Amino acid sequence: MATAGGSRRAPVPGPRLGLPLAAHLPASLGGEGAKDSLGGEKTSGNNDWFQSSRVPSFAQMLKKNLPVQSSAQTVTLPTGYSSESCSLSNMASKVTQVTGNFPEPLLSKGLSSISNPVLPPKKIPKEFIMKYRRGEINPVSALHQFAQMQRVQLDLKETVTTGNVMGPYFAFCAVVDGIQYKTGLGQNKKESRSNAAKLALDELLQLDEPEPRALEPAGPPPIPAEPIVTPEAAYISKVQYEGRQVQYAKISQLVKETFSQLISSHSQYLKCSSSLAAFIIERGGHHEVVAIGTGEYNYSQCIKPNGRVLHDTHAVVTARRSLLRYFYRQLLLFYSKNPAMMEKSIFCTEPASNLLTLKQNINLYLYMNQLPKGSAQIKSQLRLNPHSISAFEANEELSLHVAVEGKIYLTVYCSADGVNRVNSMSSSDKLTRWEVLGVQGALLSHFIQPVYISSILVGDGNCNDTRGLEIAINQRVDDALTSKLPMFYLVNRPHISLVPTAYPLQINLDHKSLSLNWAQGDNSLEIVDGLSGKITESSPFKSGLSMASRLCKAAMLSRFNLLAKEAKTDDLLEARTYHAAKCLSGPYQEAKALLKAYLQQHGYGSWIVKSPCIEQFSM
């Protein structure tokens, strides 16, 4: 990973490499005024409050608020969750309807975190520093969280490389409270932004300076220094890439072996493997498949408000709901109070937090045998030839989509009748949502911190590259949104890679509406008819006479109530309905509202909300 040292107070030159997509699009796509991630005007580059001579300097406040490295005392997290000083109704009043004219370029430029001149800076929790050091928070998201806690303005600006750096490198630098930090280089913008954020954080958090340095005498500014990109560094990067690809290929093979074993007695469902999706847990270098799903359809009949119908049976959605069942089992292990069983759980406590978190060195992978429906299947010419695209085409490809009986439509065309028929958002859009809110959902957010996907692996059976998936997941939502999200939430950036496909793609005419699901601990597969949302007669697993799937909302509420009893959180049991239990998860609901507002204000369309009566049931 190439980085560079530079002057902290040098002027920031204009961009040299990699013009943004907005530079090639019609003027109608960009809009006149630059907006922040919630639709307001961007603030200026300087923060007058922090520059005032009557208040402490940023460096003084930072030194005061950083935890003392040598002290063993516990630093508590803030008791409340930060929120913007605007109501949801105010957000709605600023929403721009999708008309083909976007209020901002589709691939958003870096947005500045807005400093607050009224509220005092927060203390930097030791847990935040530890998580960053362990690599659990990517540098860009961590820097935005830091800026939010310190109430300072942040901007990641593209700059230039000097003549002694050979090759097509991009350069970015972080500007925090008007101070420019060292320049980060990379072979793409994502890598260079990450390197720049890391350089700034390492200095701001004093990670490279265990002992404070004496103040240096005033003098001329230091000479900027760019890194020397050596052949050895390039070789190490290549070795790391090849090693990672070998690991990913083994994961794909592991998924194939697991699914083949599950259907060994049900070979008639082999063709369902074309849509296969699976979640894999890595623990201490060992990988195990913990959740599997297949399917390409969703429920399309009339609303049934009993919670016993499965609405979306697309593979990645089914696999994720199976993953939730795995999480519930792991949490029951933790709350068993049996030391041996607690040791087996993937969850553990974290100091100064009442929410559990994944144990150290545990990572979550997602394998998909094919690209998910929606924006991830963006046309290659749209992303490779920006000069030739039209505003309408860009709008259509990158906007939010809704799934209806296996087909994909723009949400802007979704009628009121469509909403009553229980349509679901596309799998691509749900992946985008999980990369901000986590995969755990609202109910489990009462017990655990957000769980994010570390890597997404896509089978190469019908996919030549993953750029469409990169855009759908990693570029529709800007890192700056992290600074507005509640504690523990962030804009996650999973690594996306092509891997050898686990199964070849096959046309499945006989069982095209069927969906298979399994989670670690299940004795057998469950088979659901995606069109009816119920278990089939031929399913190896059956729940009872109602034929309700073990993945339905009612089943999840039953597990939630059981977990609440084991965790002795009696207040959660007071929720009278499934909907009420979800609404009690305040930080999760706040993050969800911010994400929906962000997507709508940036021209991607409205997130379709199902009828409220679907969740108004109780056990």
From Swiss-Prot:
Residues 138-206 form the DRBM domain. GO terms for cellular component: cytoplasm; male germ cell nucleus; nucleolus. One of its GO terms (molecular function) is tRNA-specific adenosine deaminase activity. It is found in: Nucleus. It holds the Pfam family dsrm. It comes from the Eukaryota. Residues 291-617 form the A to I editase domain. Keywords: Developmental protein, Differentiation, Nucleus, RNA-binding, Spermatogenesis. The keyword RNA-binding applies. Required for male fertility and normal male germ cell differentiation. Plays a role in spermatogenesis. Binds to RNA but not to DNA. This is Adenosine deaminase domain-containing protein 1. It comes from Rattus norvegicus (Rat). The gene is Adad1.
